[in-house]
Swiss-Prot record:
The keyword Protease does not apply. GO terms for molecular function: GTP binding; GTPase activity; guanosine tetraphosphate binding; translation elongation factor activity. Disulfide bonds: none annotated. Residues 10-204 form the tr-type G domain. Residues 136-139 are annotated as: G4. It is found in: Cytoplasm. The keyword tRNA processing does not apply. This is Elongation factor Tu. GTP hydrolase that promotes the GTP-dependent binding of aminoacyl-tRNA to the A-site of ribosomes during protein biosynthesis. Residues 60-64 are annotated as: G2. Residues 81-84 are annotated as: G3. Residues 19-26 are annotated as: G1. It comes from Shewanella pealeana (strain ATCC 700345 / ANG-SQ1).
Amino acid sequence: MAKEKFERVKPHVNVGTIGHVDHGKTTLTAAISSVLTKTYGGTKRDFAQIDNAPEERERGITINTSHIEYDTPSRHYAHVDCPGHADYVKNMITGAAQMDGAILVVASTDGPMPQTREHILLSRQVGVPFIIVFMNKCDMVDDEELLELVEMEVRELLSEYDFPGDDLPVIQGSALKALEGEPEWEAKILELAEALDTYIPEPERAIDGAFILPIEDVFSIAGRGTVVTGRVERGIIKVGEEVEIVGIKDTTKSTCTGVEMFRKLLDEGRAGENCGVLLRGIKREDVERGQVLAAPGSITPHTTFKSEIYVLSKEEGGRHTPFFKGYRPQFYFRTTDVTGTIELPEGVEMVMPGDNVAMTVTLICPIAMDEGLRFAIREGGRTVGAGVVAEIVA
């Protein structure tokens, strides 16, 4: 019998390790790589390679991140691990590493610590949909009751931030022992992989979502009408379909009468493609950059929202001085800047460069938004911060 054909089309899932400093996130990442490549094949990455995380720049923000890949029989995973706490904050807020699920690492010798809580809060704010817990260093705890106590504590903490603490998987293991090849602890890594496969649902692909295209440019073509151009962010637009133009002004409806790419007429435009969409009955002055073209009813315009933001440090080219309430920067959504005012949390008087903070923003005109939308904060065209919409207020 011929060997089974190598399947390249496995679903792709993005995950990452989160948790308190020195609780074993990087060791666990190395252990997953080691055990899964040993079991299912692939290229192993060792601790030193993962720990020496390369520096990346995302929207001008410097982030150190390690990316590794591994396979289970049913899926392909891309996994991110960050060396420092600040890297996690930046990564999660900018969406540089979008996670379909996170592995929360808690050392059973310590239990939940301040950054454990902070990473759970960040996960809630930025919309990480699923968390699996790996209790690490269980080889160092002899007392079964102590392990139960730590597990209970972690579950309660997750419930506090609206994750299903009672129901989510908690695996008790030892990343170091698994990495050293001890079979009973290697089995725990396979149990974790099984939890990733079963607990995190297959992510919706961009093409399967409701259609949305952030408008970058507007043209008028004599005898044909108005064309808007941009890159389709999600979904598919077909000729003849109804669309809405959302944001900045009142929402208007139109019909797509043509899709073109590189001067060729097409039947449809798909997620990831740059295309022009011809709109029926729309004047050139009715549409502007910064609005979005969307499937009717799929997205609404809003002016006030709660957000989690990271303020660039001076070294990253950000502000040199703090800002206070009443600060009025521009908020850059998708393709345009909109002025807004900020409201800081109670007890917070000022925000320093390099800080992260939750704040409420009120824009001077409405923008099409969903929770989870990323934005930049700018002053005169220079980026001074990055943020994510955590909750829509109005």
